[in-house]
Amino acid sequence: MKKFTLYLILVLFSFNLFAGERPLTTADRLDIIDVINNYGLAVDNKDYDLFRSLFFNDVEARLVFDPSFFGGEEIIINGLDKWVAYIKESGALFKTSQHLIGNPLISHDGELVKVRSNLNSRGYYKGEEGRSVSLWGYYETYMQKDKDSWKITKHTFFSLGADE
């Protein structure tokens, strides 16, 4: 009887721990992956309206470069307007770019959803025929559901290497 009572208490306690956390549906996961894919598409196509639609206004963006690119600099940008301005300014250096973002690992982190995804990106500089840069690393992206859509609240890029 003691074992049964203990087992029952443990089961009820574990249900209570997860009562507030709604599991992600397949539709949620697909929508989250679409946000990540649209991020790459928006940057590559210089579609700043699409880019803006993916984020909350108070987004925090962080770029952590390894020593082979930007000398290992870390950049922190707070707010959507500043983030869009940074992306426009850095995108202006390139004629074209292509972001290949894959292997999204989606998990709950408290109230937020965390997505870790790998990046391999190549950009071709404007006015410098044949000159390009390849950059690889990974993103840690935090999202929340805003009404019916997922939006990014925090986005961090960790550079693992670059080749010019």
What residues fall within each predicted segment?
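Short, low-complexity N-terminal intrinsically disordered segments enriched in polar/charged residues
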Residues: 19-57
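A beta-strand edge to alpha-helix "cap/lid" segment located at domain peripheries
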Residues: 20, 92-164
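A solvent-exposed, acidic/Ser-Thr-rich amphipathic alpha-helical stretch
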Residues: 48-109, 113-119
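Cleavable N-terminal signal peptides
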Residues: 7, 17-18
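Positively charged n-region of N-terminal signal peptides that target proteins for export
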Residues: 1-4
